[in-house]
């Protein structure tokens, strides 16, 4: 569940009324596992931006970053925007988050999530993290770089990852990162 300007009890009750099973997740008092739905966009709390699906391991990144209110944060490789939205939520309507990604398609995914969230201190921008812009030097209070990933962090949910990875793909990924 989002925290800023969202009543968790209302979000949870709404999901349960729709037949969604809601169970507390470990580590964070606002993290929940949800199941028992057929189509996530039909879940009212998702549609209204009260919740943002994200793996708990990804949510812990926002906790570790712990942005101060009023901060300017840049999230590189941000699609689909879960970590960026989490940072914006933690800023409690202050500061701003610039969610970047390399392709316009990914930026549009981020924008869809921003629009649904209703948060106004976040925007998406197409920008390649490999190209240094002198205007970016020493302007951000926080830079989140979840560089192009292997997906190993969520392998428990996406077991096909281990079958698609090859030694050559791993070597290429290491060089890119």
Where are these regions (language model features)?
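S-adenosylmethionine
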Residues: 1-177
């Amino acid at each position: 569940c989002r925290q800023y300007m969202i009543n968790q009890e209302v979000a949870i009750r709404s999901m349960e009324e729709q037949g969604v099973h809601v169970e507390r997740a470990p580590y964070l008092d606002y993290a929940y596992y949800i199941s028992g739905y057929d189509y996530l966009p039909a879940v009212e709390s998702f549609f209204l931006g009260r919740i943002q699906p994200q793996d708990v391991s990804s949510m812990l990144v926002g906790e570790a970053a712990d942005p101060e209110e009023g901060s300017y944060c840049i999230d590189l490789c941000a699609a689909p925007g879960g970590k960026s939205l989490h940072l914006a939520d933690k800023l409690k309507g202050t500061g701003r988050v610039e969610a970047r990604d390399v392709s316009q398609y990914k930026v549009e995914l981020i924008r869809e999530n921003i629009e649904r969230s209703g948060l106004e201190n976040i925007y998406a921008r197409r920008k390649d993290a490999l190209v240094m812009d002198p205007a970016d030097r020493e302007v951000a209070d926080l830079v989140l770089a979840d560089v192009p990933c292997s997906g190993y962090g969520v392998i428990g949910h996406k077991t096909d990852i281990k079958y698609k990875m090859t030694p050559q793909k791993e070597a290429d990924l290491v060089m890119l990162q």
